[in-house]
Amino acid sequence: MILFGSTGSIGVNALKLAALKNIPISALACGDNIALLNEQIARFKPKFVSIKDSKNKHLVKHDRVFIGQEGLEQILTECQDKLLLNAIVGFAGLKSTLKAKELGKNIALANKESLVVAGSFLKGAKFLPVDSEHAALKFLLEGKKNIAKLYITASGGAFYRYKIKDLNQVSVKDALKHPNWNMGAKITIDSATMANKLFEIIEAYHLYDFKEIDALIEPRSLVHAMCEFKNGASTAYFSKADMKLAISDAIFEKQDTPILEAVDFSKMPALKFHPISTKKYPIFKLKNTFLKEPNLGVIINAANEVGVYNFLENKSGFLDIAKCIFKALDHFGVPKISSIEEVFEYDFKTREYLRS
C-alpha cells in the first residue's frame, strides 16, 4: 500500500490496521510531522518517502526522500503497488488522486476534496470510500434497486448544543472539541460549520451517481447512513464512531477481522434525528444549488480553506468562515469549467481574491 497523509488521523489508524494484517507499506508521505514519520519509517520500512518541504529533508531517516507534489507523483509512478490511500487534507490531495487514476491504481479516498472540486474529471477512477458515511452507503447499496433517497448523518459538531447567538464568541479551542470523533483540525472545524457534510453529500453524488441525497443530525454518531426505498422500506448502517472500520473496508481484501465492538442494541440509548438548521449552519443552504451545479465545488472549497485557516490562525472569527464562502460565490458565480487546468485556475483565483 502507498499511504499519503501518514501522520494524520486517517494515516495513523490505517497503519495500525496494516500492522494487524501485515500489509506491506511501500511508501509514506506526510507534511511536517517528521518525528512521527521517522517512527513510521522505522516500523514499516517503506521503499519511498515524501515530505512537503525540502528544508526538512535532512531530518528524515531514509535514503529515498521525495519532495512536494512532484515527489508524490514520482512515487506513484515508480511504486508498483496497486493501492493508494490518499489521506492528504484539502485541495493539496487532488494531484495525487488524478495521477493515481491515470495509472489505474485503486484509490482508498479520504481526500473528499478531490471529488468536491473535480468529480467530473474523476469518472472511471477505482474508488474505495474511506469516509464512514460513504463506506456505510456502499454496504447499504450493494445489489439494491428501486432506491428513493439516501441519507448520511452528522453529529452537529462541536457547537451542536450552542445557541446561534453564542457562536460569535467561540474560540478555536472550543471548535476543536468534537463530541464523538477524534480527527484533524481542518475536518473538525468543517464538522462544526457543516461544510464537511455539504462536501460529503457531493462526494456521495459522485461516488454513487445519485442526486436524491440529504443529511440529518444524529448526535450520537451511531447511525452513519440510511437508504430509503420506493416501496417505503428503509435500511440503516450502525456502528460505533471509529474510523478504523471504514478504513479497513477500503484496504482489506476480506472483511473477516473484528475491528470494533458491535453496537449492543439492548443497551443503546434512544436515537433522535434532526434536520440541519440553515440558520445555525448557513453553509448547508448550498446543498441543492451545489447538487445542481457541481462546478461550484472549486469555489466553495477554496473559500472554505481560506476561511478555516484564517480562523485556526486567529485572524478571523468562526462565523467568518461561512461569510468567506458566500463572498467568493457572489464574486465568481457558477464557473464554466471544461478542463482540469481550469479547476486549478479557479482555485488559485478564489484564494487570491479572498486574500486581496
From Swiss-Prot:
GO terms for molecular function: 1-deoxy-D-xylulose-5-phosphate reductoisomerase activity; manganese ion binding; NADPH binding. It is an enzyme of class 1 (oxidoreductase). Keywords: Isoprene biosynthesis, Manganese, Metal-binding, NADP, Oxidoreductase. Pathway: Isoprenoid biosynthesis; isopentenyl diphosphate biosynthesis via DXP pathway; isopentenyl diphosphate from 1-deoxy-D-xylulose 5-phosphate: step 1/6. It catalyses: 2-C-methyl-D-erythritol 4-phosphate + NADP(+) = 1-deoxy-D-xylulose 5-phosphate + NADPH + H(+). NADPH binds at T7, G8, S9, I10, G31, N33, N111, E113, G184. Belongs to the DXR family. Catalyzes the NADPH-dependent rearrangement and reduction of 1-deoxy-D-xylulose-5-phosphate (DXP) to 2-C-methyl-D-erythritol 4-phosphate (MEP). PANTHER family: 1-DEOXY-D-XYLULOSE 5-PHOSPHATE REDUCTOISOMERASE, 1-DEOXY-D-XYLULOSE 5-PHOSPHATE REDUCTOISOMERASE, CHLOROPLASTIC. HAMAP family: DXP_reductoisom. This is 1-deoxy-D-xylulose 5-phosphate reductoisomerase. It comes from Campylobacter jejuni subsp. jejuni serotype O:2 (strain ATCC 700819 / NCTC 11168). The lineage of its organism: Bacteria, Pseudomonadati, Campylobacterota, Epsilonproteobacteria, Campylobacterales. The gene is dxr.
